[in-house]
Structures are given as structure tokens and as C-alpha cells.
From Swiss-Prot:
Organism: Levilactobacillus brevis (strain ATCC 367 / BCRC 12310 / CIP 105137 / JCM 1170 / LMG 11437 / NCIMB 947 / NCTC 947) (Lactobacillus brevis)
Protein name per Swiss-Prot or TrEMBL: Elongation factor G
Compartments where located: Cytoplasm
Assigned keywords, A-Z: Cytoplasm, Elongation factor, GTP-binding, Nucleotide-binding, Protein biosynthesis
GO terms for MF: GTP binding; GTPase activity; translation elongation factor activity
Entry keyword Repressor: no
Classification via SUPFAM superfamilies: EF-G C-terminal domain-like, P-loop containing nucleoside triphosphate hydrolases, Ribosomal protein S5 domain 2-like, Translation proteins
GO BP, sorted A to Z: ribosome disassembly
UniProt-annotated binding residues for GTP: 19-26, 83-87, 137-140
Similarity-based family: Belongs to the TRAFAC class translation factor GTPase superfamily. Classic translation factor GTPase family. EF-G/EF-2 subfamily.
Major site of localization recorded for this protein: cytoplasm
């Protein structure tokens, strides 16, 4: 029997809550869940008792690491909320969430305004065309300033922020807000956790300013909306409903970003924020169709939210759940899916059975019989599905746009403390890498060491912590290693010839390959330019494979060789002795022979480092950047502090948090994200080669 949809599509909202670390994002989500009736007791991040942060390390560190998906209800709407981490090491979690959201709430700290990590998540949201509203939080905090925060959106994000409210008071005088659309004031009751307020006339001393801002707001809307512009120019009255509808249209087109004020911790402004989510953020019907391709014809297909269409969903997160084991979060783009039915994982071309479907409430779950288009839910029973896989109706296979994940930039060796821990560690690493595509675990074939790599020191700390807590694995950790790469800088043509005659069947493979440097980031490209069968067809894939295997261990110091074009253009073969294996070896010999003439270099990851310090420490900090082979890319004033933008090699950034803390007496902060790879200076390259026992190259 078919189940019926509880909430129509137009009354569904899939939203993310994004922010800089410490802007109060998790507390805001908590309050939303509290007021929508999902939580009976409020947990403070300060006490480590928050509903959304359900992993132990998140509660200890007071930061959100994994995006828990939670369902809430507000004024007849279903709101699926994805809580996203605000720490730079977890930007992949943010991207992963943005892929499946329709709209987002950006939370700012009312004292700091737009901070470096806000810029990162804002840029990511813009890449995915996600409409946003902004909540200026912590208005009760010392130094909070609503107008400063709104201006920081214009200046630092170049975004058209539209304040729909004015704050009544600030810091410990923050009493409520003026609604510039309704032209009313909401003043909070001091005694009952802010869950009740009085709707009153705008305070006399704010009336004139409120009217001025109301006018300015209508002008801003008219600038981006023709209907309002027409009425405005004709001098006709614009009703509140018309104004709201126009703000919604402009928000969905990313022409405007409505801004609201409040203090989640003091329970002020959260209900108005919820109203804004319903009024201004998109339903699955409002967003542009989702791109997919037909795996047989490569024809582009556009998916719309429609329950009658064939089922198509994206697995956007795999988690090991303490209660139900392996849990796959899915976003349904079209069609419906009943628990117990089969789906096709079209990415891996495997049929899978969905055992149970769960609606997630941060740490408690409700079993549901069916999911519909536009829904976000958890599925149990998908054994082969990993993050970014497409799940479709077995009779209508589709490939949804897959996710791109950055390569890890930092690596450490881990070894189990006891033999008994070895198997447990392998299981733990396998599960953790299934959950997180930017975390990789591998064994060094030469040393037998287990190496884990990730996006930063905090990222790996948390992985190691989870091994200990969730999988009870005790491990020793080595010093962090940088994920260097190798590349060619010159074009060269070389021969690789492998001949072995030792009685019986011999081995014979002979190739001529032209190697050319590829654009940075373009990776490896292989071209078959063989004419006249000088290398038989069946051996050409072996040449390609042989090159890729040899490139994995580089030519200078054992790091992967990247960004190279290889053109196989000549060679020879032996009727009896040639084999796939012989041509694989010949290809790897060609790569080795290219070292002398292709100008190989070692590339190192360069990080974008933004350092915020009080002015009096500026000179010292800039000296530190230069001493670490960094380049200062500019500075800007932030209140009485300075933001230094710089690019620094990752190898020079280990332990920098401690250095900065002592150099600025604990007042400096920095964020660091991977930016690009570039060649190391000659002296550094020589050191790396020596340390790794590699082969120095003669100039």
C-alpha cells in the first residue's frame, strides 16, 4: 500500500546552517530544534551537552565535525536541517552538505561580523548557487554591533545584504528587534528564556530611523525586482505580502541576502529566523533542476522533484552509527523509495537492498516506511555504497553529478601498540575512510608502515581519537609528513626497452614515449599515437597501466608523479616473447629514462593562511611568515586588529598554532586551507631527496 506524503513539496525546506567556528551555529540549531518541539531540554555547547554534536569529540571540543541531519516542523512546514562544521579542516563536510541543500542560514558573530572561515563557506555556497539568509547571532555579547556585521557582508563577501530588522539595543541591553517589513517591534520577556515576546509599536526614539531604513529596504528590493520597481516608480502602495514575495524571489535568485538579528544563547530572535526560513528560503520545487546523465548514452537528463518520476538519490554521507551500524544519508531528487526495496548503485553498478529508512533527529531516530522526492533520510542496509554514489531505480539507471573531493595534504604514520590492535586498526581505518573521502589510509609497500592522510592536524587528531574511542585501538603516532608530489618541467622523448632471454619463453617489450608537462591540476593523460601496429593493440593498455603504476612512486624521492601527458608513438614487438607484463615493464623503464631530460621537480602544497592579530604584534607575525618561506599577500584592518593574508608551504606550518599563541600572548588566531602545489626551492628539494634516499638530478 502506498504511503502518503506528510508535507507537500512546497512546504519542505532543506537547509544548512553554516558559520565560522564559535559563531554559535550549533546553539542556533539547538534552539531551532527546541522551538520546533524536537528537544525537551536545551543542551549548551558550553557544557558539552548539545543535541546536534553527538560524537564524543565534538562535545569535548565544542565544535561540530560531522553534519548530522535533523528533521523539524514549523508552521506546517517540514524543515530538514544539516548542521555543518565551521573548522577549516572539515570544509569537505561543508561542501558535501551544500550539495544536498536547497538553502542555507549563515550565522555570524555579532561582534566579529564576517570572519575568515565565513568567507570560505560563503564561497562554497556561492559555487553551488545556494540561496542564503543571515543570522547575526550573539547580539548580547560585549562589542556586538548589528550594522557593522551587515556592512561586513557587503565589504568582505561582496554580497547584497538586506537587513530586514533593526536591533533594539545591544550587548546586555539587547531587548529585541524591529521588523522592517511589518514595521513592528518585538520585545522579549526577560524572565522566560525569551520564548515569549510582546509585539509593540516601534520605540519612539527609533521610529524615524526605522522609517528611513524601511524606505531604503524597499528601494533595494526595487533595484532587483521589476514588479516592485514599477509600483515604486508609480508611487503606488506596496503591500507587505507583495514585499515579502519580492524578497523571496530576489533571495532565490541570489540577488539579495536577508539579514536578521538575535542571540540564540539568550533565546532571542530564533522564532523570527524560523519564519524567515519558511518565507524566504527555497522548497525543492524552487531550485534549478539537478543534472544527471544516462550511463548508456551519456545524454544529459534534468531531474525535478516529482514523486511520480523514477527514483534517484545521492548518498551524501556514510556514518558508523552507535545504534544501527552503517548508516547512509541520502537526498532524494526524484521519485519515492519504500523500505525493503532494491535500488541500483549506478556508480558501482551494483544492486543494493535498502533494509530500513530512518528520519534522523540528531541522536534519536524514527523509522519511516517510505521517502519521497525532496526528502533527506538515513538508509540502513547499503553495503557497497560510499559518499557521492548515485542510487536509482534499477530499471532507470542514472549518474548524478558526483562530488569532487580534494586530495589530503598531511600524512602521519600510525602503528598499533600491540599485535592484537593490528586487525582492529585495519577495520577502524577502513570504516573511517568509507565515511570520509578526504581521509585515506594506505600501507607503504617498502616499509610496511600504515600511513593515514587528511586535510590538517585537527582532522587527523580527531580520526586518531575516534579510533581510540569507537574502535578501542591504541596506536603510536609518527611525526606529520607532507604529501609532496613530483612533476616534469620539460618535454622529452625516450625509449623504454625490456628484453629478457633466459631459456624457454623470453620477454620483449619496446616503446618510445613523448612526455610533456601537463597543466597544474590536470593530472595524467595518455595518448595512443601508434600507427601501423608497431605496438599491437592488445599491449597498449599495458603501457598505460605500467606508466601509472610507475608514476605512483615518482622518479626523484618516491612521491607520486602528477600532471604529465604521455604519448606512445613508436616501439617494436616480438611475435613470441612479447606480453602484457613485458610492455608494462618497458613503460616503467621509459619513465625512469625520462628523469635525465624531463627536468623533474618536487611540488609542495602551499596553504592560504589568514592570520588575525592585534596591531602591536604585526611586525613579529609578518617576520614569522617570511621566515617560514611564506609570502604576504596583503593586509586589512579588522577593528583594532589586522588580518594578514599569506601563502605558506605546509611543511613550514607544523606547530604554528603554538608559535602564534606565544608570539601574540594568545590573542592571535589563524585559518589555513590548501590552495595549490608549486615547485620547492632547489635546496629544499635536495634535502627531501636526501632524506628519502632518492636520486639527485644533475642540472
Amino acid at each position: 500500500m502506498a504511503n502518503t506524503r506528510e508535507f507537500p513539496l512546497e512546504k519542505t525546506r532543506n537547509i544548512g546552517i553554516m558559520a565560522h567556528i564559535d559563531a554559535g551555529k550549533t546553539t542556533t540549531t539547538e534552539r531551532i530544534l527546541y522551538y520546533t518541539g524536537k528537544i525537551h531540554k536545551i543542551g549548551e555547547t558550553h557544557d558539552g551537552a548539545s543535541q546536534m554534536d553527538w560524537m564524543e569529540q565534538e562535545q569535548e571540543r565544542g565544535i561540530t565535525i560531522t553534519s548530522a541531519a535533523t528533521t523539524a516542523e514549523w508552521k506546517g512546514h517540514r524543515i530538514n536541517i544539516i548542521d555543518t562544521p565551521g573548522h577549516v579542516d572539515f570544509t569537505v563536510e561543508v561542501e558535501r552538505s551544500l550539495r544536498v541543500l536547497d538553502g542555507a542560514v549563515a550565522v555570524l558573530d555579532g561582534q566579529a561580523g564576517v570572519e575568515p572561515q565565513t568567507e570560505t563557506v560563503w564561497r562554497q555556497a556561492s559555487d553551488f548557487d545556494v540561496p542564503r539568509i543571515v543570522f547575526v547571532n550573539k547580539m548580547d555579547k560585549l562589542g556586538a554591533d548589528f550594522d557593522f556585521s551587515v556592512n561586513s557582508i557587503h565589504e568582505r563577501l561582496q554580497a547584497n545584504a538586506l537587513a530586514l530588522q533593526m536591533a533594539i539595543g545591544a550587548e546586555d541591553e539587547f531587548e529585541g528587534v524591529v521588523d522592517l517589513v511589518e514595521m513592528k517591534a518585538y520585545v522579549y520577556d526577560k524572565d522566560d528564556l525569551g520564548s515569549s515576546w510582546d509585539t509593540v509599536e516601534i520605540p519612539a526614539d527609533m521610529k524615524e530611523e526605522a522609517e528611513k531604513r524601511h524606505e531604503a529596504m524597499i528601494e533595494s528590493v526595487a533595484d532587483v525586482d521589476d514588479e516592485i520597481m514599477e509600483k515604486y516608480l508609480e508611487g503606488e502602495e506596496i503591500t507587505k505580502d507583495e514585499l515579502k514575495a519580492a524578497i523571496r524571489r530576489a533571495t532565490l535568485k541570489l540577488d539579495l541576502f536577508p539579514v536578521f538579528a538575535g542571540s540564540a544563547f539568550k533565546d532571542k530572535g530564533v522564532q523570527m529566523l524560523m519564519d524567515a526560513v519558511v518565507d524566504y528560503l527555497p522548497s525543492p520545487l524552487d531550485v534549478k533542476p539537478y543534472n544527471a546523465t544516462d550511463p548508456d548514452t551519456d545524454e544529459a537528463i534534468q531531474l525535478r522533484a516529482d514523486d511520480d518520476a523514477p527514483f534517484a538519490a545521492l548518498a551524501f554521507k556514510v556514518a558508523t552509527d552507535p545504534f544501527v551500524g552503517r548508516l547512509t544519508y541520502i537526498r532524494v531528487y526524484s521519485g519515492t523509495l519504500e523500505a525493503g526495496s532494491y535500488v541500483l548503485n549506478s556508480t558501482k553498478d551494483k544492486r543494493e537492498r535498502v533494509g530500513r529508512l530512518l528520519q534522523m533527529h540528531s541522536n534519536h531516530r524514527q523509522e519511516i516506511p517510505e521517502v519521497f522526492s525532496g526528502d533527506i533520510a538515513g538508509a540502513i542496509g547499503l553495503k557497497n555504497t560510499t559518499t557521492g554514489d548515485s542510487l536509482t531505480d534499477p530499471d532507470h539507471p542514472l549518474h548524478l553529478e558526483s562530488m569532487d573531493f580534494p586530495d589530503p595534504v598531511i600524512q602521519v604514520a600510525v602503528e598499533p601498540k600491540t599485535k592484537a590492535d593490528q586487525d582492529k586498526m585495519n577495520t577502524a581505518l577502513q570504516k573511517l575512510s568509507e565515511e570520509d573521502p578526504t581521509f585515506k589510509a594506505e600501507t607503504n609497500p617498502e616499509t610496511g608502515e600504515t600511513l593515514i592522510s587528511g586535510m590538517g592536524e585537527l582532522h587527523l587528531d580527531i580520526i586518531i581519537d575516534r579510533m581510540k574511542r569507537e574502535f578501542k585501538v591504541e596506536a603510536n603516532i609518527g611525526a606529520p609528513q607532507v604529501a609532496y608530489r613530483e612533476a616534469f618541467t620539460k618535454s622529452t622523448s625516450v625509449q623504454g626497452k625490456f628484453v629478457r632471454q633466459s631459456g624457454g619463453k623470453g620477454q620483449y617489450g619496446d616503446v618510445w614515449i613523448e612526455f610533456t608537462p601537463n597543466e597544474r591540476g590536470k593530472g595524467y593523460e595518455f595518448e595512443d599515437a601508434i600507427v601501423g601496429g608497431v605496438v599491437p593493440r592488445e599491449f597498449i593498455p599495458s603501457v598505460d597501466q605500467g606508466l601509472q603504476e610507475a608514476m605512483a612512486n615518482g622518479v626523484l624521492a618516491g612521491y607520486p608523479l602528477v600532471d604529465v601527458k604521455a604519448k606512445l608513438y613508436d616501439g617494436s614487438y616480438h611475435d613470441v616473447d612479447s606480453s602484457e607484463a613485458a610492455f608494462k615493464v618497458a613503460a616503467s623503464l621509459a619513465l625512469r629514462n625520462a628523469v635525465k631530460s624531463a627536468g623533474p621537480v618536487i611540488l609542495e602544497p602551499i596553504m592560504k593562511v589568514d592570520i588575525l592579530v592585534p596591531e602591536e604584534y604585526m611586525g613579529d607575525i609578518m617576520g614569522q611568515v617570511t621566515a617560514r618561506r611564506g609570502k604576504v599577500d596583503g593586509m586589512e584592518a579588522r577593528g583594532n586588529a589586522q588580518m594578514i593574508h599569506s601563502y605558506v608551504p605546509l611543511s613550514e606550518m607544523f606547530g604554528y598554532a603554538t608559535t602564534l599563541r606565544s608570539a601574540s600572548q594568545g590573542r592571535g588566531t589563524f585559518t589555513m586551507t590548501f590552495d595549490h602545489y608549486e615547485p620547492t626551492p632547489k635546496s629544499v628539494q635536495a634535502d627531501i631527496i636526501k632524506k628519502n634516499g632518492g636520486t639527485p638530478v644533475e642540472d
